[in-house]
């Protein structure tokens, strides 16, 4: 884990896992635009994901938990929107227990497949087990996205053991239930079908995302296109966006040739990194001030 007091088990996750997942989603979008279908599955037997690590949540401060849930939601939203934004459809292939944040992770996928065996079930047990509501979109997605009846949603959220097999399909919790003996083959077939039906344009070459260069000091962070100045006495962070120093690319070929050094791409990556740093390492800074500098004509 990121701090003492917990150990990641049963495919549970913490902020570190979600940072890796967010990085993967962005790399699928930019480095592998030829990919049309992404299958999300577990590398462990008998468990898909147990969700957010309970001991981590118990040991974390309130502000850490709030920012953790926000970042987790943003990551879920990113791959949920990937089909519309970048033509990549995400499939959740569930074998084993899929509970709490683990099921919320699957709910953000565009298609959910569940194997039909004695150990595979989906559930949101936060209310009966922890007396809290699901924190990363579970209730919203089962009713608004999957169109589950609200009375069934109430029952579902009160069941500790979750819902299996045909009932999960009947309650609209999953899109497809497959016999365990045919599950892996069916997942492969469905992925190929979705890829064949995709109207995403064929792209053979992506943009490799290299590591960001930054310098962290006691009173700020310096990137190529962003400066972050920390004023802890006033609990304020000043984020300065610097304009481009070279003309914009004339066409897509020039933009692709610039790779991860293209101004807008690098600026957005640096800004995302700076915001993540401020959220979790400078939580006492309650005011962020955004400024810009540079030649306005260079943006046009």
Model segments located where?
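Short acidic/His/Gly/Ser-rich catalytic and metal-binding motifs that mark active-site loops
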Residues: 1-2, 47-51, 123, 132, ...
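Short glycine-enriched, charge-decorated loop/helix-capping segments at active-site entrances
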Residues: 5-11, 55-62, 254-261
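Conserved catalytic cores of soluble enzyme domains
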Residues: 63-203
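A structural preference for short, pocket-lining loop segments at secondary-structure junctions
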Residues: 14-63, 73-93, 115-118, 236-239, ...
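Asp/Glu-centered strand-loop micro-motifs enriched in Gly/Pro and often flanked by an aromatic residue
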Residues: 7-16, 242
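Amphipathic alpha-helical segments at domain termini/boundaries
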Residues: 1, 104-108, 147-259, 263, ...
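Short helix/loop segment immediately N-terminal to the Walker
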Residues: 2-7, 81-88, 252
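Short, glycine-/Ser/Thr-/acidic-enriched flexible segments
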Residues: 45, 112-113, 119, 127-129, ...
């Amino acid at each position: 884990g990121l701090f003492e007091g917990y150990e990641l088990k049963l495919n549970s996750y913490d902020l570190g896992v979600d940072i890796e997942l967010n990085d993967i989603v962005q790399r699928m979008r930019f480095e592998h635009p030829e990919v049309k279908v992404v299958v999300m599955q577990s590398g462990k037997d008998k468990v898909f994901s147990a969700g957010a690590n309970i001991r981590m949540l118990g040991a974390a401060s309130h502000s850490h938990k709030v920012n953790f849930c926000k970042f987790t939601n943003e990551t879920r939203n990113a791959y949920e929107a990937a089909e519309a934004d970048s033509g990549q459809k995400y499939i959740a292939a569930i074998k084993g227990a899929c509970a709490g944040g683990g099921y919320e992770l699957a709910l953000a996928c565009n298609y959910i497949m569940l194997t039909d065996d004695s150990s595979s079930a989906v559930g949101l047990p936060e209310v009966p087990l922890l007396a809290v509501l699901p924190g990363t979109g579970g209730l919203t997605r089962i009713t608004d996205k999957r169109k589950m009846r609200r009375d069934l949603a109430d029952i579902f959220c009160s069941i500790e053991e979750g819902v299996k097999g045909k009932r999960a399909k009947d309650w609209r919790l999953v899109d497809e239930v497959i016999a365990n003996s045919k599950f892996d083959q069916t997942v492969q077939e469905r992925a190929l079908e979705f890829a064949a039906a995709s109207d995403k344009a064929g792209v053979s070459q992506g943009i490799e995302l290299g590591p960001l260069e930054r310098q962290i000091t006691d009173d700020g962070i310096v990137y190529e296109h962003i400066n972050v100045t920390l004023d802890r006495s006033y609990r304020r962070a000043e984020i300065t966006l610097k304009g481009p120093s070279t003309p914009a690319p004339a066409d897509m070929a020039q933009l692709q040739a610039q790779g991860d050094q293209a101004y807008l791409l690098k600026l957005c990556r640096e800004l995302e990194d700076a915001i993540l740093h401020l959220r979790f390492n400078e939580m006492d800074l309650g005011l962020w001030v955004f400024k810009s500098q540079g030649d306005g004509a260079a943006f046009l």
